[in-house]
Amino acid sequence: LDLPADRFACLSGPNLSKEVAQRQPAAAVAASESHSTAVKVAGIATTGYFKVFASTDVIGVEMCGSLKNVVALAVGMSRGAGFGENTAAMIETRGLAELTQLGVAAGAQAQTFAGLAGVGDLVATCGSPLSRNYTFGANLGKGMSVDEATKVSNGVAEGVPTTAAVVALGEKY
C-alpha cells in the first residue's frame, strides 16, 4: 500500500491483556515515523492507569513486540522442563542481547530494547502464566508436542511462527 507513514503508529509494551482490562497500572510506547503522530497517539491512549510514551523507532518497537515472544517460548520451555531462576535469567538476558543486535542490524535503535517495548515487555512476557507464549513454551517443556500445546493453549502463541522469521533475520544480518 502506498499510504503516508505519518498516518500510522504501533503500540507495544509490557501489557498483559488481562491486567490492562482490569485497569492495573501499565505503560506502553507508541511509535510512528512522525514524531507528532507518535505524540498524538500517546496522548489519546494515555489514561489514569495507562501511560503511553512516544517514539519514532518504529522498527525497534515492532521488533521488540514480536521477537520477545520467541524468548518467552524458550523461558517457558525451561520452566516446563523443571529449570529455575538462573536458567530463566540466562535465557532472558542473552535473548535480549541477541534481539538487540538483530534489531540494530535491521535499523532499530539499541535504546528501544532497553525500554518498555524491549526489556519491559520481555520481563512481563517471560515471567507470567498470563503470557500465551510463556505458557505454550512451558507445555512444550513438559513434553507436549506443538499440536498438543496448541490444543490446550488459551489463544495464539505468536512466538511459534515468529521463530522462523527470527532465524531468517539472523541469516540475513
Q: Model-predicted segments: where are they?
A:
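Short beta->alpha linker loops
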Residues: 11-15, 58, 117
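NAD(P)-dependent Rossmann-like dehydrogenase/reductase catalytic/cofactor-binding core
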Residues: 55, 68, 72-79, 83, ...
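Short, flexible turn/loop "capping" segments at secondary-structure junctions
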Residues: 19-24, 116
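Glycine-/Pro-rich loop/turn segments that contact NAD(P) or position catalytic residues
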Residues: 1, 12-21
